[in-house]
């Protein structure tokens, strides 16, 4: 590799870029949740929780865990893992554990990307996932 890099160095750099991709997908998901609740409010319907929205994805990766749960948890991991002195006992860690991402996982964002997008790390797949989910969300929960 140019500059004396090795495979580990390349994966370290990819981990950051993929983590940013998950944060961007999370922002899209949060925007969809806000949109559906605005639509519901305009027709005097009760708001929907984020948890219910994430669970509405039609594709699960494990029992009760959807692709949207994984996107959200991976984004939260990426944003906050440097603050963690120890691995947390929270919803993010619980969801990641269901897809075998733990404190021992060297590259969590890479592992999550491979699960959702394949080994080619094509982040456009994340966009497709959240776009299709948003369309389903608007039609099913508005």
Language-model region placement:
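Acidic, Ser/Thr/Gly/Pro-rich intrinsically disordered interaction regions
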Residues: 1-19, 48-142
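Short, well-structured hydrophobic secondary-structure segments
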Residues: 10-40
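Short, solvent-exposed secondary-structure capping/transition elements
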Residues: 30-45, 80, 84-88
């Amino acid at each position: 590799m140019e500059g004396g890099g090795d495979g580990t160095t390349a994966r370290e750099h990819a981990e950051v870029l993929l983590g940013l991709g998950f944060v961007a997908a999370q922002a899209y998901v949060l925007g969809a949740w806000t949109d559906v609740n605005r639509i519901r409010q305009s027709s005097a319907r009760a708001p929907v929780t984020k948890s219910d929205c994430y669970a509405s994805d039609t594709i699960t990766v494990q029992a009760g865990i959807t692709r949207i749960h994984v996107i959200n948890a991976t984004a939260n991991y990426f944003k906050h893992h440097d603050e963690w002195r120890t691995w947390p006992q929270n919803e993010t860690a619980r969801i990641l554990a269901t897809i075998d991402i733990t404190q021992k996982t060297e590259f969590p964002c890479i592992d999550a990307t491979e699960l959702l997008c394949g080994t080619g790390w094509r982040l456009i797949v994340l966009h497709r996932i959240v776009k299709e989910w948003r369309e389903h969300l608007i039609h099913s929960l508005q």
